[in-house]
Amino acid sequence: METSGMTNASEKPSEKHAETHEGGCFCGSVRYAIEGAPTYMGNCHCRDCQRAIGASFVTWIGAKPENFVVTKGEIATCETSPGVHRGFCRRCGSSLTFTGDDWTDVAITAASLDDTSFVKPESNVYLDHRQPWVIIDEGLRCYDKLP
């Protein structure tokens, strides 16, 4: 198991952003802040996310790495497939982040945010793996794989 290379509070960017969102794990051992608007919001239905999160799908929001700041504790990570790292709280196991060698952003689990009222997914990906009981909002962009 590794610890994440995410920015720590002491390395917080000096530029103030108009928008800040905070969140953390279930037990409160890990806290984070996202400065600025998310780069994307979407639902992933892939089997890896289903198994890692323990749900039918996960809603991710993206942030530039320099705008994602761990303000308390440390996010532990494990490499779940080559070049893919999932971040979680070492104490309670809450899933928090997803990073990949081929990804420029940090993906954060939307459900770990303190306030989710601004979250509006734009797409569904990996619909070829969706669970049969999940009803899909056809108003969102829908893809069987990643676009």
Where are these regions (language model features)?
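A short Gly-Trp-Pro
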Residues: 2-147
